Design a protein with these regions (language model features):
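Bacterial N-terminal signal peptides that target proteins for export
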Residues: 1-10
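Bacterial N-terminal signal peptides
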Residues: 10-18
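Short glycine- and acidic-rich boundary segments immediately preceding or forming the N-terminal edge
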Residues: 23-69
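Loop/turn elements at helix/coil->beta-strand transitions in domains of secreted/extracellular proteins
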Residues: 57, 70, 82-85, 125-130, ...
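Active-site-proximal beta-strand/loop segments in catalytic clefts of secreted hydrolases
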Residues: 61-64, 77-78, 89-92, 132-137, ...
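Metallocarboxypeptidase
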Residues: 72, 178-348
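Short beta-strand-to-loop junctions in surface cap/lid or active-site-entrance loops
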Residues: 74-82
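Active-site/substrate-binding loop(s) of hydrolase catalytic cores
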Residues: 97-100, 105-242, 306
Length: 348
């Protein structure tokens, strides 16, 4: 009877899971690692943040999602009599979850340091900061729950078959804004970039339009992630800026962000993209052209040395990404204050 040496088998059983986890830790992890905010815990997370300084923060419901009537939450942070406002939207696309964590960490920093820290104190004296962790609670629910890794759109039944087809149904919320919408050729409803049946057809976008009409936004920043890696760690400006003063201001603020954020895995910093950008109904085009608001998009999450786009990293990298992007946002806010102060002085 042949004997079997069990030691190599035991060794393999112990080591292989470790090797697998180490490989995962350097790439994408799905289901998401434990420190990602999950949809079912978002409301409680927001309540905890407001509790830090309830006199300067309020949780708002600005609207509801198109298919499932889920609330779209916002945090309104700062003094109520502040004359200007800043908008940060952490997520338009369900799979792009890094911005949710970043936006909540930003809110926590603002409230934890106010009024002790000079930077936060001065900012919140003059600006209200509106933070919307996710504009797409439907897509966020699908991805954060582990149902599907790549879910870009909301859950509208776009093929009208009376059921949710996770991979194809939905509208790309960042192509549904009513500026340049008619120029977008993406009309196939099963496309991941489907722009919707008409401009602002989605209730999520209607909520943002209403908010924009009510507030005097001096800056709008939209956090995204590039699943393909083509746009990783780039900052995109509005289309058709035409070198105007407003465009130059937008570009200068974006440059501050880029200079403040090092790439995740490769050498160098984030880059402001200098080529032509999409003439579609996206958020930055809408705010820039409709309201004259400096607005730009930041693609969070880098490519590793193998060229793989990492938008669902492990906890350790997640924390690093969140920390440096919160610092970049704060640097942009400080630069905005400086520029606005100079503009006001020049008007006197």
């Amino acid at each position: 009877m042949q004997t079997i040496d069990v030691l190599p088998i035991i060794f393999g059983m112990l080591i292989l899971p470790c090797l697998f986890s180490c490989v995962q830790a350097k790439g994408n992890m799905y289901p998401l690692d434990t420190k990602y905010i999950k949809a079912e815990k978002l409301n409680a997370e927001l309540d905890q943040i407001v509790h830090i300084s309830p006199e300067f923060a309020e949780k708002r419901i600005i609207g509801f999602s198109s298919a499932e009537n889920l609330p779209v939450y916002a945090l309104q942070i700062g003094k109520k009599d502040a004359s200007k406002a800043i908008l940060v939207i952490g997520q338009h696309h369900g799979e792009e979850v890094l911005g949710v964590n970043i936006s909540l960490a930003l809110a926590e920093r603002l409230l934890s340091n106010y009024p002790k820290a000079e930077k936060e104190s001065h900012l919140l004296e003059h600006y209200q900061v509106w933070i919307i962790p996710t504009l797409n609670p439907e897509g966020f629910r699908i991805v954060s729950s582990g149902m599907l890794r790549n879910k870009r759109k909301n859950n509208r039944d776009t093929n009208n078959n009376q059921q949710l087809d996770l991979r194809t149904d939905g509208v790309d919320l960042n192509r549904n804004y009513p500026v340049f919408w008619e120029l977008d050729t993406e009309t196939e409803n099963n496309s991941p970039y489907y722009k919707g049946s008409e401009p602002s057809s989605e209730s999520e976008i209607k909520a943002i339009i209403t908010l924009a009409q009510q507030q005097n936004f001096a800056l709008a920043i939209f956090l995204h992630s590039s699943i393909s890696g083509v746009s990783s760690e780039k900052i995109f400006l509005p289309a058709k800026g035409n070198g105007s003063e407003l465009f130059q201001k937008t570009s200068s603020l974006a440059a501050v962000y880029a200079a403040s954020a090092k790439k995740d895995y490769l050498k160098g910093n984030y880059e402001v993209y200098n080529g032509s950008t999409s003439e579609v109904g996206n958020a930055r085009n809408y705010f820039f052209h409709r309201y004259g608001t400096p607005a730009f998009l930041v693609e969070i999450g880098g490519k590793n040395k193998r060229g793989q786009s990492i938008i669902h990293p492990s906890n350790a990298m997640l924390e690093k990404i969140v920390d440096k992007n919160v610092k970049a946002l704060m640097n942009v806010f400080a630069e905005l204050e400086t520029q606005d102060t100079k503009e006001n002085e020049n008007k006197l």
